[in-house]
Amino acid sequence: MTMHRSSIGQTLAPSLAVSCWVQGEPIDLSQLLGHVVLLEVFQVNCPGCFLYSLPQAVDLHYRYGDQGLVVIGIATAFEDFDKNTLENLRSLIDSGRVIGETLRMLSEHQQLQNGRWPVRLPFPIAMDHLIPADNKVTPDAVESFIQQKLPDFTSQPIAQQNRIREQTTAYLANLQYYAETFERFALKGTPSQILIDKQGILRYSRFGYDSELEHDIQDLLNESVS
């Protein structure tokens, strides 16, 4: 999987915007000062989330939970809104039922037992808050979206910039919802991992499976709180 990492480390993490907590008690990030927080952002219809990122998050939860790591799962939706639903999230949590491309890929990789995903997610899980999109696409909205998602946009060839504008315009015109937590953290896709330090500072955001995630968690756990 392609992985994009960014180090931030200057501002407090924004608050979570969720429609409901499907597993565990409601959590406010301000309650977790003194802990290192891993936000594992996924979609139900995201094969890579289930093949790589979610199993990694489960492993980290078990190995570092007693050292001060708190893992929170955020199910989001920025596409495939008929599949990335609260109902399908509940079915996943309750019975391991998977759907769509996730079902197909897990089956191909022989990761299912009796047609179900056998991995139990042991940490709190919430559904991102979805806001209906108005689909009024303006040039300013297109440029703002591109700059947020593609910081190197202006370095692209002009022909590529024009193609990106056309694709973005079509995407926004057909967008059904905005996922509020996904947008607050300026994420680029799923799976995404967000690391927040003991002082509530947003330290890292990365898109795709990241083999360095454990090392970064260890570093944050070892930091002293000033």
Residue ranges and their predicted role:
Residues 144-226:
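Thiol-/selenol-based redox modules, centered on thioredoxin-like
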Residues 14, 47-48, 55, 124, ...:
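Proline-centered helix-kink/hinge sites
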Residues 2-5, 111-113, 179-183:
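Short, P/G- and charge-enriched loop/turn segments at secondary-structure junctions
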Residues 52-142, 155-156:
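Structural microenvironment flanking redox-active thiols in thiol-disulfide oxidoreductases
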Residues 27-58, 70-75:
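Short active-site neighborhood of thiol/selenol oxidoreductases, capturing the structured segment around
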Residues 1-30, 162-170:
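N-terminal "domain-start" segment that seeds a small globular fold
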Residues 15-38, 58-64, 182:
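A short beta-strand-turn-helix
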